[in-house]
Design a protein with these regions (language model features):
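Anion (oxyanion) recognition and catalysis
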Residues: 12, 32, 153
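Catalytic beta/alpha-barrel core
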Residues: 19-20, 134-142, 157-169
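Active-site beta->alpha loop and helix N-cap motifs at the rims of alpha/beta catalytic domains
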Residues: 45-48, 53-144, 148
Length: 190
């Protein structure tokens, strides 16, 4: 019987890689131990952690800190999300360092209410990158998101193109990535 974790076996046999979505700290540890190469967090992550029986009290501590840092509700939500994602990013740093930044990314997405404003997406992406060097900016593959992705690629910032619902969207972002990479010589994780 093969004792190697399932996800490590799959990665050796195919180009498939295992990312975990919206994990608790314990789930992140288990995922990494079983071959996870990255993590993604949705805008709903903080609420899921507040509601989680093992994470709720921990999350409330960060929410209290965020409330003390700003009077603006929108900014508070962003600060809270960053505070919650940072410990997860720290857990994936050894993977990131071991692979020279090829794996171990933790993606974070801003509030989807702003997904039609490329300037807000860009601002949020730069702010999110301050969390940790392994932060990957999760950006919707919409016309506004594509504008933001252009800036991220030019700045050599890893991106996670999300909300891809058709082949044409995938082709568009891949063509855009190749075009900008060719022009700038930058090839961030994608």
């Amino acid at each position: 019987m093969n004792k190697e974790p399932y996800f490590l076996r799959v990665m050796k046999q195919s180009p498939t890689e295992f990312w975990i979505n919206n994990p608790t700290r314990r789930q992140a540890d288990l995922a990494i131990a079983n071959g996870a190469t990255g993590c993604t967090n949705n805008p709903s992550y903080t609420q899921k952690m507040l509601d989680h029986p093992d994470e709720g009290e921990y999350a409330l501590k960060f929410l209290d800190e965020a409330v003390q840092e700003t009077d603006d509700d929108w900014e508070c939500a962003e600060v809270f999300q960053r505070k919650m994602v940072k410990p997860i990013a720290e857990k994936f740093m050894p993977v990131f360092e071991k692979t020279d930044g090829e794996r171990g990314h933790v993606s974070i997405q801003g509030d989807p209410i702003n997904e039609d404003d490329p300037e807000v997406i860009i601002r949020d992406a730069f702010a999110n990158r301050k969390i940790s060097p392994n932060i990957c900016c999760k950006i919707p593959t919409t016309s506004s998101g594509l504008k933001a992705m252009e800036v991220m690629i030019e700045e050599n910032i890893p991106i996670n193109a999300t909300e891809i619902f058709g082949v044409s969207q995938m082709v568009t972002i891949c063509e855009k990535y190749l075009e900008i990479s060719k022009r700038t010589g930058k090839r961030p994780a994608f």
